[in-house]
Swiss-Prot record:
The protein's name in its UniProt record: Recombination protein RecR
Highest taxon of source: Bacteria
Gene: recR
Family: Belongs to the RecR family.
Keyword field contains Lipoprotein: no
Originating species: Ureaplasma parvum serovar 3 (strain ATCC 700970)
Matching HAMAP family: RecR (MF_00017)
Zinc fingers (C4-type), renumbered ranges: 57-72
Residue ranges constituting the Toprim domain according to the UniProt record: 80-176
Annotated NCBIfam families: recR (TIGR00615)
Molecular function in Gene Ontology: DNA binding; zinc ion binding
Function: May play a role in DNA repair. It seems to be involved in an RecBC-independent recombinational process of DNA repair. It may act with RecF and RecO.
Record's keyword terms, sorted: DNA damage, DNA recombination, DNA repair, Metal-binding, Zinc, Zinc-finger
């Protein structure tokens, strides 16, 4: 049975969300169209308010409503350690596991020729300047164990190779191949940090 073109356009828009396939997109589209106008207006309003008022920390790119996020402002964090993660979800996942007390740097993407994602499309290019301007002694690269994640990790390692007195680590065994941090449980994350591989002294 054919559906109105507007319905198909809504489904296509919903499919652009992470992890949403055709089946769930259709389910959500039917759900939204069955709601009253107030529900739709409130939903749109909240999305617009979040997009307008939520900023990115000027240091790590974490979501905040100030120039600096609570993590970067927390004087009890270990300012000698910097963990490089791909997404805000990765940061939240590690924080919820309560296994790390350093600072973060969110790349907002991984280098991918397949997806046409280059350095300029990410926050990778700001890593070196931040390391040079900070007091970091240890860098932990926690990009995913996918092809794109490995390419990104290698690029970051090369970018930082001329900085003296900097130890560089890659998260260790525990995170499955072709997987990312947000799918790992607390124990797996803990083991990946315990077993982190030293890339450079």
């Amino acid at each position: 049975m054919s559906k109105p073109v507007e319905f198909e356009m809504l489904v296509d828009a919903l499919k652009s969300l992470p992890g949403v396939g055709t089946k769930n997109a259709n389910k959500w589209a039917f759900f939204l169209l069955q709601q009253d106008q107030k529900y739709i207006d409130d939903l749109i309003k909240r999305i617009k308010e979040a997009k307008t008022n939520i900023l990115k920390c000027k240091y790590c790119a974490n979501f905040t409503n100030k120039d600096e996020c609570d993590i970067c402002l927390n004087e009890y964090r270990d300012f000698t350690k910097l963990m490089i993660v791909t997404t805000n979800e990765d940061l939240e996942r590690i924080e919820s596991a309560n296994i790390y007390n350093g600072l973060y740097h969110i790349t907002n993407g991984e280098i991918s020729l397949r997806k046409n994602v280059v350095i300029e499309h990410t926050n990778i290019k700001t890593i070196k300047e931040r390391v040079l301007n900070g007091s970091f002694k240890e860098i932990i690269i926690a990009t995913s164990y996918t092809h794109d994640g490995e390419v990104t990790a290698d690029y970051i390692i090369r970018m930082l190779e001329d900085i003296k007195d900097l130890q560089i680590y890659r998260i260790g065994f525990g995170i499955p191949l072709n997987s990312s941090i947000d799918y790992a449980d607390d124990e797996t994350l803990k083991q990946s940090l315990i077993n982190k591989r030293k890339i450079r002294n």
